[in-house]
Amino acid sequence: WLLIQLVGDGTRKMAEFRPGDIVNIMLPLGNSFTIPSKEQENKRLLLIGGGVGTAPMLYLGACLKEAGFEPTFLLGARSKDDVLQLDEFQRFGKVYITTEDGSLGEKGYVTNHTILKEVRFDQIYTCGPKPMMVAVAKYAGAEAISCEVSLENTMACGIGACLCCVEKKKEGHNVCVC
């Protein structure tokens, strides 16, 4: 899959790609999520994605399914028109949706979805807008659930030299998202 949100010249050019085009890409960038070991196959895994942050959840879900897990997805979007590749997500696990306008799934935000009250998850993975991930991390902390966060940010050079993707960690030092 190649899911793109048009935000600048680079992504506009990427949107013009056609099947069979040859492209030169520097991947992967960033760090990967942790895939649990086979001994943990009964772990209840929740993948929470919001906006453009749903794209990495699709790939992670495919990897988890291939490793023998049954992930649960909780996807947030502004409206039903912003929910992408729903059929693909459903291939890899159960899918719950929230939309801000209520046009698909529950109305509201992922952190208010009823599934969080009904099921006790062992591990949460999340990617999306920073306020959403902060809320997810707070929920996970309050429930003593392990949570891995994948930051989304603008990336220009992909190697950290331009410092456009810098984020401050709670410990005080900076890290590059790329």
Predicted regions and their residues:
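Ferredoxin-reductase
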Residues: 1-21
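Reductase modules of NAD(P)H-dependent flavoproteins
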Residues: 78-178
